[in-house]
Amino acid sequence: MLERPSFPRLGAGTRHHRPLGQTGEGSDWLLAFTGISGIAGMMIPYVPWGLIRAMQRGSIELTSPRGVWIFNCAILPSRLHRTVERKGNMKPDQDLFGKVYLADCLCDRRLRWLRKSDFQHTCCAWCQCHNIRTTAGPSSRCPERDRGELCGCGPARDRCRGGGYGRCLCGVGRIQIPTPNRGFPVLLRGGKPCRERVFHRSSSHAAGFLHEEQLLFHCVCGQGHVGYLGRGRQEISRHRRVDQRHHWTQTPKDCFRQQRGGVLGATRERCLYARQKRSPSPGRHPALGSPPAQLRQDHLHNPHRLSSRLHLAWVRPRTRHQTGPHEADPGHQRRHFRAAGGEIPVLGESGPGDRCAGRPRGFYYLRGFIGCESFVYEHGWVEPQERTWNCGFVVERGDGVVCGAGVEEEVGEDVQGRCY
């Protein structure tokens, strides 16, 4: 009968066969293992659960704008949003190291690092009908489903008062909040500011004039108000109703000036042209009239020169049953207007001589773009008596390629690296 071979127990010495627990190498390893386990157990409460939660939600930028790695997620997005909704001044509840905050950017549902001076850049996106949490919570009403009602902006009576929400001029369909003593903040897109800093603090302020860094924006109340950004003012400097008779905004007589990088591109010639008092005619728009011959020829013969011009194309309104991007109406005469300043045209009502005669009334957007990105300028108008489905607005490149539709539900998500 064979005997079972005897093997030394784990931890026992090979020479003297000391059992586990007595003095020897085995007890040393056991003590070391116990110590390491105890230290690890003590460190468990300090695991950055907020960071783990953020990683589960999607990608997260772990570096601050200054390149400092921070692993503290003490400010939860829900708490941050409640603070924003309650105070309205974007002040955080807690100061993380006095420099950087973690904020839940609703533009693309990612967490972003913001400096204390840039905390106002936290943006909230249009609802998109995709259950995106807004400042008012998941029960916020979608603008597309509620005929222009904005998500997370509170009662309609609070939207046009001082310090209300303003449409971001970057053209992504996001919303900015004017902040005290800073005018309009620069929007963080993908962790970086917009490609052109068009929201700088105004160098000089005069009521009724648009200066180099004092831009026009459309209040999202849906009533056609237009606000002008002032310097050192805690509220929107002024709102103006859209002229319902002519359907274009009575903007100041000053013009957009040439920005660094050729964003707005309002040369003196175009400024003077836009300010001229011309009577409306079938071939002219009541706001801008006919462009000068030199500019018209220059545009026709150089369709790819998009450096600093705002190319606008009118499209048919968006109906309730349309879900995809809509094309430019082939039966509708397309024209390119240079919204350099002066009066900005907004079409919408049927009338004698109106190029949109017979078209449904609704929400029209004007957008300028650089290259293939919607950019710089937009203005909205809604007839208060009849809030119809939001009408879209597309931008068209010089070679005739339609870059995309300017409808909120199509531009709010996944806007990085694509035309929209």
From Swiss-Prot:
Q: What's a GO cellular component annotated to this UniProt protein?
A: membrane
Location of this chain's protein in the cell = Membrane
Q: Which keywords are on file for this protein?
A: Membrane, Oxidoreductase, Transmembrane, Transmembrane helix
- Residues spanning the membrane: 29-49
Q: What happens when the gene is disrupted?
A: Impairs sphingofungin production but accumulates decarboxy-3-keto-presphingofungin which is formed by the spontaneous decarboxylation of 3-keto-presphingofungin, the product of sphA.
**Enzyme category, top tier:** oxidoreductase
EC identifiers of the protein: 1.-.-.-
A single Gene Ontology molecular function, please? oxidoreductase activity
Major place of localization?
Answer: membrane
Function per UniProt: Ketoreductase; part of the gene cluster that mediates the biosynthesis of sphingofungins, bioactive molecules acting as sphingolipid inhibitors via inhibiting serine palmitoyl transferase (SPT). Sphingofungin biosynthesis starts with the PKS sphB that produces an C18 polyketide precursor 3-hydroxyoctadeca-4,10-dienoyl-ACP containing one delta-6 desaturation and one delta-12 desaturation.
The protein's name is Ketoreductase sphF
Species name: Aspergillus fumigatus (strain CBS 144.89 / FGSC A1163 / CEA10) (Neosartorya fumigata)
